[in-house]
């Protein structure tokens, strides 16, 4: 599915993964300001050089991330809004306000250019929407706060709650891919 989307738009598909060691602090990598953005930019440069497509270091991005990856792609959107075509946040969003319950998470600024980027928040219903207790119950309140802040500033943000899932990705790709496809079609034509 993802490969077909990339081929349709003549895009490169890069799927980095990171397995966090048990009890490690997610913020060390999922907040790109802690240095992971440098690794990403270097990987685009290196992949471009190795593949003979040096333009990879300069092309726009369509970003999708899950959990800490959602926080990360949202953070990259805050840092590089002029490079982002679309951003899909599955079960994780960057914080835009300080949370006294989670002081280790630094809030991001909301640059004006972010308001032009289509962003979709996609939590599972069992992440605080219909199930209010449990390990992932904080996901929906974080998404709701993010949504209200971005939409309140006039941003292009939506919410699509997966009606069947919790923190797993489930079948969310069946909505994410057509949404990103539409964003690519609309926004790439304007570059």
Per-range role (PLM):
Residues 176-191:
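Catalytic active-site module of serine/aspartate enzymes centered on a nucleophile-bearing elbow/loop
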Residues 70-81:
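Short glycine-enriched nucleophile-adjacent loop
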Residues 53-67:
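Alpha/beta-hydrolase fold nucleophile elbow
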Residues 85-174:
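The feature captures the conserved acid-bearing segment of alpha/beta-hydrolase catalytic domains
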Residues 9-23:
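Conserved alpha/beta-hydrolase
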Residues 28-55:
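Alpha/beta-hydrolase active-site loop
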């Amino acid at each position: 599915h993802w490969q077909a989307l990339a081929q349709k738009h003549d895009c490169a598909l890069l799927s980095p993964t990171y397995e966090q060691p048990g009890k490690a602090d997610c913020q060390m990598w999922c907040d790109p300001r802690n240095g992971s953005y440098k690794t990403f930019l270097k990987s685009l440069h290196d992949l471009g050089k190795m593949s003979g497509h040096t333009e990879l270091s300069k092309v726009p991005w369509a970003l999708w991330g899950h959990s800490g990856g959602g926080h990360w792609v949202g953070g990259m959107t805050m840092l590089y809004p002029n490079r982002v075509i679309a951003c899909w946040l599955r079960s994780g969003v960057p914080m835009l306000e300080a949370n006294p319950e989670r002081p280790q998470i630094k809030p991001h600024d909301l640059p004006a250019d972010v308001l032009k980027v289509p962003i979709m928040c996609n939590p599972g219903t069992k992440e605080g929407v219909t199930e209010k207790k449990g390990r992932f119950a904080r996901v929906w309140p974080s998404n709701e706060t993010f949504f209200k802040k971005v939409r309140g500033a006039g941003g292009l943000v939506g919410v699509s709650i997966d009606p069947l899932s919790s923190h797993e990705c489930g079948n969310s790709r069946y909505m994410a891919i057509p949404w990103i496809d539409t964003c690519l079609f609309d926004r790439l034509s304007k570059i």
